[in-house]
Structures are given as C-alpha cells and as structure tokens.
C-alpha cells in the first residue's frame, strides 16, 4: 500500500495525467460534440476521422461527448487524487519544515550549508546584534538567541506550490460539477416567438421572448454579427399579477461574444437561420410558409416546395440563403425559372403570379447553466496566485558567534535565485564589518 501511495503521489504521474487530459481536450475541441449518432455514422463511417476513428468507434469510445465521458472524468478524478496525495506527502511537509525554526548551535553545521563564511571579529557578540538589526531593517524574520541567530525571508514561496495544487483540485471539482449538474439547450426563435424554461418540479420558471433579430452583413453579403433583442420574465407564485407572472421583466440585447448572464444562466448568440417566407399567390391573402434547410443545395440554403396548381401539381422550389434574398425559383426538373426579391414585383410561374412579401430570420440561442463556473474561477484564481507566490525565493540565514576564538560564522540556504543570494550574503558581512 505504501508503494502505491508513493507512486500515486509522484509528481511525474501528475504531469503525465495533465498531458493525457490536454490531449483528450484537444480531441474534444477538434471533433464536433454532442451531435446525433446518425450524423457521426454518416460523416465518418466512409471517411474515418484522422483516418483512424470511424463513426461507430467514435460512439463506442465516447468521443462524441469527451468532456462528460466516463474515461475523461476518471482521468480528472485520478489527477485530483494524485495532486491531493502529492500535496499531503510532499508540499505540506516541506511547508511545515520551512515554518519550523532550525537552531544550529555548532559552526560545523553551518559549514555544510550551500553558502558559508567565517570572519574574524574582535566582538563576535556585537556582530550578531548588528546582523540582527540589519536583517530586520530589510524585512527578514529573525529569531535571536545567546550567541547565535536564525533568519528567514520569502516563506510565502513555500505556500505557492500547495496553493497551485489546491487551485487545480478546486478547478477540476468545478469542471466535474458543471458536466454532471449543468444544462445546455439550443433553440431557434423567430421574432415574436417565446419559450418557457421549467424548473425541476415542472413549473414555469422563466419566459424568454425574442423581440427582434438583426443580421449584420458585409458588402459581399456574408454575415458578420447577429443581434437579438430579448425580453426575460420571471414566473412564479409570489407577487403574481392577474396573468400569473411576476412583475419583473428584463430587456437586453445579446450578440456574438456578448452573452447575457441572468440568475446563474448564460444566454449566447450562437447561430442564425431562416424561419419562414411570406408569399402571395395571385390574389390570395399573404401566406407565411415555414422554411426547411436543404443541405444538398449548400451549407446555408433554405427553401420550401410550393405547388402552383390547385391539385398540387407542377411544384416549384423556392430556395434562398439570405433574409435579403434573392429567392431562386426552380422547376421540378432542377432548371432555374426566375429570381424573386422580398418586397419586389410578382413573377408569373406556371400561369400563377407569385410575389414574396418578406423573409423571417430566426435567432439561434444557446442557453447554458453551469453551477461549477464559480468553482472553476476560484480554482483558477487560487492556482494563479500560487504560481505567483512560487516565484518568491525562500532564503534562510544562520549565524554563530565564537567569543573565545573571536570568530563569526554565517551560513545560508536558498531554494531559487541562488546566484543573487550568493551575492547578497557577502554584502551583509561587508556591512557588518564596516559598522
């Protein structure tokens, strides 16, 4: 058991696990996540991903949801245990050793330190006192006894590694909590439409309505930014009005890279689509028809099949890729008949006048509730502070006075920046001799 604990707490094991987790995270970044199994079969069975993973192997290895897979969570658990044991067996004893004052009584003990000097002093006791005052003036902690002293500075540097390990463990706990307890929802909303979010008891908790949606395009027509004007209403049983909703609403605009955070939930502007097209056939009233995506025609192409006769014969396809048009009209044989524009003039198609009144875009919203985010931020902050503290060098100095031999012995240790410390110690001795 002791050998197992020693192996688990080995820093090399933790570093190896970090590399494996980083590699696994890159797989999750490169491969689309949480899509339907059919999409993986269709995309990768004939052409394996990285020429290794077919659609079936991706599903079996849980690569379709890397961050919530059993093996990825097991790696995080293993790394957390390794960091806890490493801190317990190595970092904590090192910190306790540093906090404990070491009292060297014999000059021979100082001679074995990394830095050691012996000088002739007619008043070694006075030299001890001068060194004590000099170190205190420069912020050192000093413990003086009869004929000897011990001093230290930079103890916070020993706390740094322990804080880094603690921060990483907190961060991983937050990540796991977010994966297991978080929720994710993707929805397309057309302007004027709304959706209700339910709580764990199945009751309405929040109403989200899309007031307006705007797509900003460059001169070529490519989308650059999407903006949604949202109205949020809390729903509940207290402070209710006649409609059953609380008199508390919030209007906010979201766009790409500018999400809305509300009540522990984050609403992202994730995508856009075309929801419906409003047409007029002859002298008919305006008809709003839902649009479907046609991936066989292009990546972002929507359309609707429109019959031009009362018996449903002679259908045509209205295809478009922008809310501003144009709308291309194709015959059943795939030939292009004509092109229409929203709000433009009507065109005669198979003896029927067809006019496009407008096109209704839809906003793609991504709603995420991640309860582990505060822990992730706290863990990252603790680890960052620990990393900064780790850069502080811990320095220790001991001095012993031999009154009869008129000798003054000084020695020191340093865990980093040894060259600077090797220059600092002789300066202390020189200042003592000049006083």
From Swiss-Prot:
Pfam families the UniProt entry points to: ResB
Superkingdom of origin: Eukaryota
A GO-annotated cellular component: plastid
GO term, biological process aspect, one: cytochrome complex assembly
InterPro entries xref list: Cyt_c_bgen_Ccs1/CcsB/ResB, ResB-like_domain
Localization annotation: Plastid, Organellar chromatophore thylakoid membrane
Alphabetically ordered keywords of this record: Cytochrome c-type biogenesis, Membrane, Organellar chromatophore, Plastid, Thylakoid, Transmembrane, Transmembrane helix
Record's bilayer topology term: Multi-pass membrane protein
Transmembrane segments: 11-31, 69-89, 159-179
Reported function: Required during biogenesis of c-type cytochromes (cytochrome c6 and cytochrome f) at the step of heme attachment.
Similarity comment text for this entry: Belongs to the Ccs1/CcsB family.
This protein's name: Cytochrome c biogenesis protein CcsB
Protein species of origin: Paulinella chromatophora
Name of encoding gene: ccsB
């Amino acid at each position: 058991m002791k050998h197992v604990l020693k192996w688990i707490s080995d820093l090399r094991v933790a570093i190896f696990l970090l590399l494996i987790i980083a590699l696994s995270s890159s797989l999750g970044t490169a491969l689309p996540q949480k899509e339907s199994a059919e999409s993986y079969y269709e995309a990768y069975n004939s052409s394996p991903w990285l020429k290794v993973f077919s659609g079936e192997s991706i599903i079996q290895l849980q690569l379709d949801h890397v961050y919530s897979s059993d093996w990825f969570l097991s790696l995080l658990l293993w790394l957390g245990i390794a960091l806890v044991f490493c801190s317990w067996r190595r970092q904590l004893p090192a910190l306790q050793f540093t906090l404990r004052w070491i009292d060297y009584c014999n000059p021979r003990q100082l001679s074995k330190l990394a830095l050691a000097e012996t000088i002739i002093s007619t008043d070694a006791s006075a030299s001890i006192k001068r060194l004590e005052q000099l170190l205190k003036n420069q912020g050192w902690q000093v413990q003086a006894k009869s004929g000897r002293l011990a001093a230290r500075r930079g103890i916070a540097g020993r706390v740094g590694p322990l804080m880094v390990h603690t921060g990483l463990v907190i961060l991983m706990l937050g990540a796991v909590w977010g994966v297991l307890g978080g929720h994710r929802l993707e929805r397309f909303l057309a302007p004027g439409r709304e959706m209700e979010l339910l709580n764990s008891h199945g009751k309405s908790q929040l109403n989200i309505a899309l007031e307006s949606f705007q797509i900003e395009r460059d001169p070529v027509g490519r989308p650059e930014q999407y903006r949604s004007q949202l109205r949020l209403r809390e729903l509940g049983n207290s402070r209710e009005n006649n409609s059953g909703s609380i008199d508390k609403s919030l209007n906010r605009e979201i766009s790409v890279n500018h999400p809305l955070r509300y009540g522990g939930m984050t609403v992202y502007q994730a995508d856009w689509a075309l929801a419906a097209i409003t047409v007029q056939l002859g002298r008919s009233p305006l008809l709003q028809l839902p649009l479907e995506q046609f991936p066989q025609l292009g990546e972002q192409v929507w359309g609707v099949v429109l019959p031009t006769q009362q018996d449903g014969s002679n259908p045509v396809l209205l295809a478009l890729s922008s809310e501003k048009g144009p709308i291309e009209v194709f015959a059943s044989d795939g030939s292009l008949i004509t092109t229409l524009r929203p709000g433009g003039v009507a065109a005669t198609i198979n003896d029927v006048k067809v006019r496009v009144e407008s096109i209704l875009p839809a906003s793609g919203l991504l709603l995420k509730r991640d309860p582990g985010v505060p822990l992730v931020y706290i863990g990252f902050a603790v680890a960052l502070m620990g990393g900064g503290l780790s850069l502080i060098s811990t320095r220790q100095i001991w001095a012993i006075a031999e009154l009869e031999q008129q000798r003054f012995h000084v020695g020191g240790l340093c865990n980093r920046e040894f060259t600077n410390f090797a220059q600092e110690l002789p300066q202390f001795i020189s200042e003592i001799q000049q006083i």
